[in-house]
Design a protein with these regions (language model features):
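His/acidic metal-ligating clusters that form di-metal
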Residues: 1-89
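Binuclear metal-dependent phosphoesterase catalytic core
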Residues: 81-150
Length: 150
């Protein structure tokens, strides 16, 4: 429905915001499910395809919408809370979906004990090619690697 409305209104971009990290690839099993980037099937610890996967249908539908939309799409999520901005989504042939950007926010990461609660400023420039730009905002009292100012 989001993409149908964006197309009907001739929107220049779409931003989706979710708590969950659905896992995009095979890169980081400590933070998200491992996932075959072509089939989008979740992998078990032994490397086999999982039979239960709550995100595969969602990701397959999202991939189809991103390809058809052809304009910038940002997926913002927390959950694993490792701050990064990247382009992890591939099409079924293994080509990077260049109009898709994943933004993973700061947060309290229970896996590594980091209470990295900061915030992210998003700028929207409808006439720019990428539309969205991002600027991390560090809260001085929440610094974990560099001591907070006295």
């Amino acid at each position: 429905e989001t993409f149908a409305q964006a197309k009907a209104q001739n929107s220049v971009a779409v931003m989706l915001i979710s708590q969950a990290n659905p896992g995009w690839d095979l890169s980081d099993p400590t933070r998200a499910p491992l996932r075959d980037p072509l089939t989008l099937k979740e992998k078990t610890a032994e490397g086999a395809d999982s039979t239960t996967d709550g995100f595969q249908d969602f990701l397959l539908a999202l991939r189809g919408e991103v390809v058809a939309f052809r304009k910038p799409v940002a997926y913002v999520h927390g959950d694993s809370h490792y701050f990064r901005i990247d382009k992890p989504f591939l099409d079924a042939s293994g080509r990077r979906l260049e109009n898709f950007t994943r933004v993973e926010t700061f947060g309290n990461n229970q896996a590594n004990g980091t209470n990295d609660v900061q915030w992210l400023k998003v700028m929207v420039a409808p006439r720019s090619r990428e539309v969205f730009s991002y600027q991390p905002q560090i809260v001085p009292a929440n610094r974990v690697a560099v001591p907070a100012p006295q």
